[in-house]
Amino acid sequence: MDVRESISLQNQVSMNLAKHVITTVSQNSNVIFSPASINVVLSIIAAGSAGATKDQILSFLKFSSTDQLNSFSSEIVSAVLADGSANGGPKLSVANGAWIDKSLSFKPSFKQLLEDSYKAASNQADFQSKAVEVIAEVNSWAEKETNGLITEVLPEGSADSMTKLIFANALYFKGTWNEKFDESLTQEGEFHLLDGNKVTAPFMTSKKKQYVSAYDGFKVLGLPYLQGQDKRQFSMYFYLPDANNGLSDLLDKIVSTPGFLDNHIPRRQVKVREFKIPKFKFSFGFDASNVLKGLGLTSPFSGEEGLTEMVESPEMGKNLCVSNIFHKACIEVNEEGTEAAAASAGVIKLRGLLMEEDEIDFVADHPFLLVVTENITGVVLFIGQVVDPLH
């Protein structure tokens, strides 16, 4: 299976995850998360698992072996998620970290995989007597790696004396629009909420041609980021239902249509009569383990087979399971571009149709979905929904 095919399958997993997050965690509020971040943490857990746990994660992520998964993840980390700011592209930073209790040690083969494939730093920690300090250490690490955007990926009390292992992943993205918006043209306007009420929000606009396509029941806008000297091309896509309350139906359509994202990319610039998109800034956090369990990924959290390929002690490995995968992301969209960050931490404890028009409108004055994608590979960095640009 080639990388592009693998990514297409990953995107199906990501959109399914997005639907589950939105419907179970936060149907009526803004959502932003990074499927790329969550997939990296799951990949690391799979690499340290055996038996049913390994098989279930591989099946969930649609891979046939851990070797295939590791080489795919390694390629994504090094090729797609590499920083491009030095050559004029988006600032991108991905970091992985592992904290293991001082009573345990990683298997040398697993530690090497962490360092080589996932560029992950491993740290010893004293969970027995200093769990609070370890939480603070992980959070300050996430803050540093996300340029200060995320200050708390692990909530208070998320680790205790029973905790043996924490994996964390942080992803930071800052891109400048290829065509910046003129700040003097930004005006207040009405945004329609899901409950029928309205709020007044600042809307950006432009008279320039835009990458917009109209489909049956929705429109898609692509805003490209300034590209660096490498081949990567990042864009933010806005999926805007025609109906003010059409977000849920659009999400269903995206999830139930294989290859939806790849097949609904606006390829040409068109004249736009009325063009308005809101400015917004928000953060969103959730426990991804609950969502993953709801999607059938249960073995890593039950400790049936343990994480025997991670640690030197086979007996201790059998009793290790994942207790939580905490995820936090934030995003800001303004005239200059986008700043976004996400961090995930997995805590492991000891068991106790297309219509072409010459000119169209694109007025995002009601709830919409957004996706940040690398266009050459199709890798999805962030998925979200904006239901209220003020919150």
UniProtKB/Swiss-Prot annotation:
Expressed in root tips. Expressed in siliques (at protein level). Glycans are attached at residue 375. The record marks 351-352 as: Reactive bond. Keywords: Apoplast, Cytoplasm, Glycoprotein, Protease inhibitor, Secreted, Serine protease inhibitor, Thiol protease inhibitor. One of its GO terms (cellular component) is apoplast. One of its GO terms (molecular function) is serine-type endopeptidase inhibitor activity. Residues 337-361 are annotated as: RCL. Pfam families: Serpin. Changing residue 351 to K: Slightly more efficient in metacaspase-9 inhibition. Its main location: secreted. It is found in: Secreted, Extracellular space, Apoplast; Cytoplasm. The reactive center loop (RCL) extends out from the body of the protein and directs binding to the target protease. The protease cleaves the serpin at the reactive site within the RCL, establishing a covalent linkage between the carboxyl group of the serpin reactive site and the serine hydroxyl of the protease. The resulting inactive serpin-protease complex is highly stable. Inhibits metacaspase-9 (MC9) cysteine protease. Functions through cleavage of its reactive center loop and covalent binding to MC9. Involved in the control of elicitor-stimulated programmed cell death (PCD). During infection by the necrotrophic fungal pathogen Botrytis cinerea, functions to protect cells by limiting the PCD-promoting protease RD21A activity that is released from the ER body or vacuole to the cytoplasm. Involved in the control of water stress-induced cell death by limiting the pro-death protease RD21A activity that is released from the vacuole to the cytoplasm. PANTHER family: GH10112P-RELATED (PTHR11461:SF211), SERINE PROTEASE INHIBITOR, SERPIN (PTHR11461). Interacts with RD21A. Belongs to the serpin family. This is Serpin-ZX. It comes from Arabidopsis thaliana.
